[in-house]
Amino acid sequence: MAYSYTEKKRIRKDFSKLPDVMDVPYLLAIQLDSYREFLQAGATKEQFRDIGLHAAFKSVFPIISYSGNAALEYVGYRLGEPAFDVKECVLRGVTFAVPLRVKVRLIIFDRESSNKAIKDIKEQEVYMGEIPLMTENGTFIINGTERVIVSQLHRSPGVFFDHDRGKTHSSGKLLYSARIIPYRGSWLDFEFDPKDCVFVRIDRRRKLPASVLLRALGYSTEEILNAFYATNVFHIKGETLNLELVPQRLRGEVASIDIKDGSGKVIVEQGRRITARHINQLEKAGVSQLEVPFDYLIGRTIAKAIVHPATGEIIAECNTELTLDLLAKVAKAQVVRIETLYTNDIDCGPFISDTLKIDNTSNQLEALVEIYRMMRPGEPPTKEAAETLFGNLFFSAERYDLSAVGRMKFNRRIGRTEIEGPGVLSKEDIIDVLKTLVDIRNGKGIVDDIDHLGNRRVRCVGEMAENQFRVGLVRVERAVKERLSMAESEGLMPQDLINAKPVAAAIKEFFGSSQLSQFMGQNNPLSEITHKRRVSALGPGGLTRERAGFEVRDVHPTHYGRVCPIETPEGPNIGLINSLATYARTNKYGFLESPYRVVKDSLVTDEIVFLSAIEEADHVIAQASATLNEKGQLVDELVAVRHLNEFTVKAPEDVTLMDVSPKQVVSVAASLIPFLEHDDANRALMGSNMQRQAVPTLRADKPLVGTGMERNVARDSGVCVVARRGGVIDSVDASRVVVRVADDEVETGEAGVDIYNLTKYTRSNQNTCINQRPLVSKGDVVARGDILADGPSTDMGELALGQNMRVAFMPWNGFNFEDSICLSERVVQEDRFTTIHIQELTCVARDTKLGPEEITADIPNVGEAALNKLDEAGIVYVGAEVQAGDILVGKVTPKGETQLTPEEKLLRAIFGEKASDVKDTSLRVPTGTKGTVIDVQVFTRDGVERDSRALSIEKMQLDQIRKDLNEEFRIVEGATFERLRAALVGAKAEGGPALKKGTEITDDYLDGLERGQWFKLRMADDALNEQLEKAQAYISDRRQLLDDKFEDKKRKLQQGDDLAPGVLKIVKVYLAIKRRIQPGDKMAGRHGNKGVVSVIMPVEDMPHDANGTPVDIVLNPLGVPSRMNVGQILETHLGLAAKGLGEKINRMLEEQRKVAELRKFLHEIYNEIGGREENLDELGDNEILALAKNLRGGVPMATPVFDGAKEREIKAMLKLADLPESGQMRLFDGRTGNQFERPTTVGYMYMLKLNHLVDDKMHARSTGSYSLVTQQPLGGKAQFGGQRFGEMEVWALEAYGAAYTLQEMLTVKSDDVNGRTKMYKNIVDGDHRMEAGMPESFNVLIKEIRSLGIDIELETE
């Protein structure tokens, strides 16, 4: 394989044995693809597919007026251009969105004509609000903050059969039910009651007998019975009664008479149970009629009404039970044929028949009225109202939609072959569902498993946005219908009919405040990527935390390869919020699919198929680690497989599919944990969750022991700068990289230059620092997809969340008791865990009713020293180091007791008497914060004069833009002239500046000309003249284009900012705060091994080895056995080997060994100890040297999950590094120099500093605000709260009998308002007496009692 620009600089030793059949897919595809389909941005009218916005419009339009004389049709839509780019939106606090313009057609029909002739057509584009755009990293910028829309896992529409698990009735009887769930519309439930009658519920209202619904559909009793039951036919001939025999139906019954064949031979004796053997004999004997006694009919149910043969009078209605009296009537009327329902207790129960018996309705109208009463209790029913209501419930496309998914699931579940059909229900659908339900109750068929991923589907961003959009459009539709009737009379245009506000409001509400629109976690690249790959069962139309039971949260066999069984939050959301597995994707119906390799006759092919949970059930699927021979055949006698959602073993020839990779089971975060297979699941869960909380350190350090997924995560997260096109690095500095694009990648009309402006010290959503550093040098050749610059937590294009620390597992004076961590001072000195946090502080100047607030350096009653960091505009300088309480932005607010008269205002304006009536409301640095000002932004409302600071910031920004554009032009111009030079040199000229006719043009001549004079050359060859003209035109076009671009940016910068009403000016100050690691900070490894730093020890006191190398961290060995996360120990051993090899390479470099020796040693490391072979021969000597230099700090290793390094390979690595194979060494106590009594495990572990810093949690208060009601201090750091002398503290003082102290505590020191102020006054006056009054809490108590309706008063005697 060819190495990319960054890979060849540092190759990871890979221990995996299994081949890569399939690359890890693009990790953000689920977000980007979904939203791309929703917008269909570049599509023309013909290319529009019936999805997303287009589908939403088509479902609501055409809108027809109530009279039917006017209609509004939808033609198409187009999206405009965004006003600002992503960075500008974040800065200005606006939404990154594009205007949506919809072309609609208003058609007015001629009232007079009979056949709806068209009288008038008007077509117009209508603005329908703004649609947020997704950034290229799968996020949305809403009001300046970066948000993510999390996908939702919800119950798929369709039909589901279930039972109550015996919980409803005390007998424990299983009550079966069926539920038809549409995508939108009313739910329809059928359920059995303990007496085995079937009931129906609509939208979970009160239940009605199911037959009411069937009657409402127009079925008669007889049709209902025919649909559900077979019939037994009896013939009456005089005194004999003959049954038309269907032998199969007799099975399991007890013979009430002897059953004989034609010859009179007894086949079944009376009283015997009829078995399958008897039935075979009856069929062989060809018995078709069976004479039965008349009492055989008693208790049977009539299937067809019995009619008097002579008079036509109905003797018995269908579905009545035959009694002796009825039989007598039948015999008297000489009826010759009776049909009864065939039912039995085993597999054909009389459920529908029983239901009809408890049904009070007798015809369709009564049934409709009954349903109307249930849906709209208290309203008088009319025939029309009842019919309309019922028709709209399930049979109107506007109110009810199963959706394509629902129809497919519905048809599959009830056993139909076609998977397409209408979105509304039909009579047959309802009958089929009831039949299936009755079959299940009869013991044929099984209930569904609701937690099966074939019954839950994923709703992605696009689909949710489309639903919201449709909601908005339906609101618009109501308004448009009202106005359409006016349209014809008043000659209105489409624009006058459509008010886009409801659409815009629906979209805004969804992106701004939906439960699934979340503030993006931006601690580090991994937390971004996992947030976008989240799948939540919560949210609108989903579950709620309180109602979700254990089953929904549990791991299901179908999660395999679709949803990660490890990564889920701890706490109330466990199992409800999941992460997508590495290779999972959604299919067109929204079901999660996983990839598999096809296996034919035990030969594994390279063909890959993606299957959903339903499709995979019938397959026999081998694991990715199954042993194959050279030909790719399965060789084991029995292979571990999955079949029918069970784990079992099968012969190789039965296997039909095979997993693609061992890591397809887990999510991205879990696949970053090396030796995951040796960790307990609970700890792995904590490990994958804590990696997301790691704070990017000052200098990222790649993990010595990784899994090989680090590069994918860094590349796909979007924090690195990736080359869009290949080329040569033209120039590079800390803030930008300029690439001159290779000629073969430049398309005509494009600029042959790519400029990448790097993000420098920007604040993330979590206040961590986003900073990019270039990796390339001038003149380097890069290819498309190479990494040009590292972002936060990335090191040479690999994810690097923490630091490699030398750890020892040993107790150390109790400092590592209970998971505490003992750190060496060296870690702090080397800034290993120093992080930068950026805080944004905002100062807003508003227009108050006493006059405008002003931002100024002229602040009353503030000394000169406090103002020395402000400029003349009253805003702090960039670069100033500030402490808590320093002024950042000076601001004064008018404080007038009285409102001024116009005359006074004028006098004030003339004489400028300010100080007397303004108060200081400056923005100050909050308590407990000190840092450096790194940026200031000033936003001014239109029409308000901009201050000097705003102008200087604007000038700086313009200079930067101009510099970029000039650079671009310089390269384009340079490339054009180079091409011209190649064509001109050596060609003959007709004339030109200081040139005779027929002279050959030389390099020297061209160098002597200014570039503008080149175009004055007249060549002998006309083609060259044409080329010169084209070049001249191209260059002037380019210049014009860039000038226009500059003017456009300038216009945007100079126009006023769109601020909230009443706001005149906003100043944002960004502070960078450097945080070193200190006791109280939380740290963790990748295996769920977390702890708090307890002490930072001097280097000389730390345990050290025989060479005098001290360890960085001492961890408690007792944290390992009970937690069962042994992966950390293996990581420590392999880390030691990696570091040891790096030191060995370093010694070779210092001794200036030959390149051949280096190459040989590298070959030993990479290719002789297990795992994947690396092709070092394709690297030249210089590249080998560069590689060796980068490996000095340690040779990075990759042990992929479930396919990692074996114990023997770790030992071999340790041996190669000349280290003890046990991974243990003798340590010495740094304080005494004595050797510890036994060898200690020492090695390198990757440690993270988590975003739970003691600085953010520690807080102190002397005086501060009080709660309004109780007059006690507020609680918590955010409210600047204090401590409360609470109930238990009062008990303590009571126990001591310290009455005076207690009185003081409960009154003047706490919430006796008058007492406190009096006390303060007394202390100032030097009078140390105390007068205790009434504590506010007592008043609260009295108010509480009064609120219960008890009159209580405190009377003073």
Swiss-Prot record:
InterPro entries: DNA-dir_RNA_pol_bsu_ext_1_sf (IPR042107), DNA-dir_RNA_pol_bsu_external_1 (IPR019462), DNA-dir_RNA_pol_su2 (IPR015712), DNA-dir_RNAP_su2_dom (IPR007120), DNA-dir_RNAP_su2_hyb_sf (IPR037033), RNA_pol_bsu_bac (IPR010243), RNA_pol_bsu_CS (IPR007121), RNA_pol_bsu_protrusion (IPR007644). It catalyses: RNA(n) + a ribonucleoside 5'-triphosphate = RNA(n+1) + diphosphate. Keywords: DNA-directed RNA polymerase, Nucleotidyltransferase, Transcription, Transferase. One of its GO terms (molecular function) is DNA-directed RNA polymerase activity. SUPFAM superfamilies: beta and beta-prime subunits of DNA dependent RNA-polymerase (SSF64484). One of its GO terms (cellular component) is DNA-directed RNA polymerase complex. This is DNA-directed RNA polymerase subunit beta. GO terms for biological process: DNA-templated transcription. Belongs to the RNA polymerase beta chain family. DNA-dependent RNA polymerase catalyzes the transcription of DNA into RNA using the four ribonucleoside triphosphates as substrates. Its EC number is 2.7.7.6. Pfam families: RNA_pol_Rpb2_1, RNA_pol_Rpb2_2, RNA_pol_Rpb2_3, RNA_pol_Rpb2_45, RNA_pol_Rpb2_6, RNA_pol_Rpb2_7. It comes from Pseudomonas aeruginosa (strain UCBPP-PA14). The RNAP catalytic core consists of 2 alpha, 1 beta, 1 beta' and 1 omega subunit. When a sigma factor is associated with the core the holoenzyme is formed, which can initiate transcription.
